[in-house]
Regions:
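Hydrophobic transmembrane alpha-helices
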Residues: 11-82, 89-90
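Juxtamembrane non-transmembrane "cap" segments at the membrane-aqueous interface
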Residues: 160-187
Length: 220
């Protein structure tokens, strides 16, 4: 069990480093419009957006079409605002701090798998949206960025769930994958396998996610 947990922590650290490096690369090569602000002001903004995201992450919304371990929240809204206002690097850091704050306030009910998924999948939404928005700052590019981010989140999130998160969840909880699929079947008879679990539970969340965050375009 200890070996499994250490391996999972190592994967989390590597993924964070990779996403942070990718965000830095985008910021240096694409986002030339970023205003120079004092480090203390940037830290203040990141702290504010992270705190708001952490609180919103506590307000989880159950999904009638998915098993209980899939929930939705509006915590990506302040993360997206952070990335739009401060850049992709700030977005990734805000995403991480938001999840850590939620863990401090509430802990985890998914052996950290759900929290890791929230961070990674959130970054696949925020990074493309921020890069496109900073290429040309308009309401239209904000909407296009969120649409592209949602597409990236849907494709990556589906593959990530099917190939890593669901098997890892089963491994850490010592559950057969068939039992996890059965949780989905109890909610939706169309869920009979991991691919259909992803199709009917993960993909609809992405569309709902986009609709819920469209208001961010009116704030930029």
């Amino acid at each position: 069990m200890l070996k499994e947990n250490l391996s999972f922590i190592g994967v989390c650290a590597l993924v964070f480093a990779a996403l942070l490096g990718l965000a830095y690369l985008f910021e240096r090569t694409v986002c030339h419009d970023l205003q120079r602000r004092s480090r203390s002001r940037n830290i203040s903004y990141v702290a504010m957006f992270s705190a708001l995201g952490g609180v919103l992450m506590l307000l989880e919304i159950p999904l009638f079409f998915a098993p209980g371990f899939y929930k939705m929240d509006l915590s990506e809204l302040p993360v997206l605002m952070s990335a739009f206002y401060l850049g992709p690097v700030a977005g990734v850091i805000t995403e991480l701090l938001k999840v850590l704050l939620k863990l401090l306030l509430k802990g985890t009910s998914t052996a950290f798998v759900g929290d890791f998924a929230n961070f990674v999948v959130g970054c696949t939404f925020v990074l493309p949206a921020a890069v496109i928005y900073h290429h040309h700052k308009t309401r239209r590019t904000a909407i296009v960025g969120m649409a592209v981010g949602t597409l990236c989140m849907t494709v990556f999130g589906s593959l990530f769930n099917a190939l890593y998160l669901i098997p890892k969840f089963a491994e850490l909880f010592h559950l057969p994958i068939d039992q996890i699929v059965a949780m989905g079947t109890a909610v939706n008879k169309g869920i009979t396998s991991v691919p259909t679990l992803v199709l009917f539970a993960v993909v609809p969340v992405s569309y709902t996610h986009l609709r819920a965050h469209e208001t961010c375009a009116d704030l930029v």
